[in-house]
């Protein structure tokens, strides 16, 4: 299922429209669509993306995502007791390079919550 984030965009409290989320893709084979978007699609403009996933997702998709991992800075969070809390946010913040221009979350809802929060704090597209 492809979700166009513009369908859910609403003006912020400051009256402006903010578009931090480009697209949400939930379907079998989503990894293939991500690779295509990075090489030929709407994500090709980003030169220094940070991909965040957890150990479960990394293990399950490692072979499929080899090309994507080569194009990104990759942070693999330990899935054991992973929570969207200050500790996880600090791990991401300490790992990030200054030139990160996109954050990609691959995997669980917790990974997405952490990624979305950091992207919002640093005003990086997500």
What are these regions (language model features)?
Residues 84-126:
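Glycine/threonine-rich beta-strand-loop-alpha-helix active-site module
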Residues 1-102:
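ATP/NTP phosphate-donor binding region
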């Amino acid at each position: 299922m492809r979700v166009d984030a513009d369908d859910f965009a609403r003006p912020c409290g400051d009256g402006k429209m903010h578009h931090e989320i480009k697209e949400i893709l939930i379907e079998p084979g989503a990894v293939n669509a991500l690779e295509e978007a990075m090489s030929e699609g709407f994500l090709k403009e980003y030169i220094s993306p940070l991909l965040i996933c957890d150990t479960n997702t990394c293990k399950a998709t490692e072979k499929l995502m080899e090309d994507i991992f080569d194009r990104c800075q990759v942070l693999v969070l330990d899935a054991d007791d992973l929570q969207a809390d200050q500790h996880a946010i600090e791990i991401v913040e300490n790992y990030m390079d200054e030139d990160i221009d996109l954050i990609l979350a691959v995997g669980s809802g917790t990974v997405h919550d952490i990624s979305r929060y950091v992207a919002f704090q640093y005003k990086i597209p997500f």
